[in-house]
């Protein structure tokens, strides 16, 4: 029946209507490799790089100083801020207090919560002064400091020595008195 209906058409039309299976057989079938048809082909493309000139002078001003400057020279000591440089008397003791990079004594103030006040039902706070960078006989330093503070304050103080870290914690004494003690010793 198909042949009889094809006789009606011209030979040119028949060639257009005829179905050829050779093109499908040569091409890869879609279901055999679905990723090949789904993903685009990879092509290498190198990015272009262009260096932009940047003025780093504003950033360099904010960077910390790599080398610690020398101790500043003043006309008289102590300075108006109360700072004094270390003296030769500091080398005569059994212990030594290394100064920080900004040439100040390594004294740090902490505030910690203490006991509950029963009248106000509020916690009292206590100030602890931590002395760091203690080299040498740290217990001799603590004994000298304790006797100096108890003499000036008139009451006993609590202290804690951390020999491994080279730290002393003092409770019940103002930071200013501890600073005066170390300046009087030449540190």
Curated annotation (Swiss-Prot):
Keyword Cytoplasm: no
GO terms classed as biological process: translation
Chief place where the protein resides: mitochondrion
InterPro entries xrefs: Ribosomal_mL49
Any one Gene Ontology cellular component term annotated for this protein: mitochondrial large ribosomal subunit
GO molecular function: structural constituent of ribosome
Location(s) in or outside the cell: Mitochondrion
Pfam families linked to this entry: Img2
Protein origin, superkingdom: Eukaryota
Keyword tags: Mitochondrion, Ribonucleoprotein, Ribosomal protein
Gene3D superfamilies: SUI1-like domain
Similarity annotation: Belongs to the mitochondrion-specific ribosomal protein mL49 family.
Protein name per UniProt: Large ribosomal subunit protein mL49
Organism: Caenorhabditis elegans
Lineage: Eukaryota, Metazoa, Ecdysozoa, Nematoda, Chromadorea
Gene name as annotated: mrpl-49
């Amino acid at each position: 029946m198909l042949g009889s209906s094809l006789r009606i058409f011209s030979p040119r039309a028949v060639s257009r209507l005829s179905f050829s299976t050779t093109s499908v057989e040569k091409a890869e079938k879609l279901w055999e490799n679905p990723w090949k048809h789904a993903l685009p082909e990879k092509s290498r493309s190198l990015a272009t790089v262009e260096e932009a000139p940047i003025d780093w002078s504003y950033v360099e001003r904010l960077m910390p100083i790599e080398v610690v400057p020398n101790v500043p020279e003043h006309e008289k000591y102590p300075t108006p801020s109360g700072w004094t440089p270390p003296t030769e008397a500091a080398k005569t003791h059994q212990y030594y207090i290394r100064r920080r990079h900004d040439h100040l004594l390594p004294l740090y103030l902490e505030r910690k919560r203490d006991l509950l006040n029963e009248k106000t039902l509020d916690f009292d706070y206590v100030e602890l002064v931590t002395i760091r960078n203690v080299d040498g006989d740290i217990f001799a330093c603590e004994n000298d400091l304790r006797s100096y503070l108890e003499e000036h304050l008139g009451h006993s103080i609590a202290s804690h020595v951390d020999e491994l870290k080279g730290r002393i914690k003092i409770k019940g004494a103002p930071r200013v008195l501890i600073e005066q003690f170390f300046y009087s010793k030449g540190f």
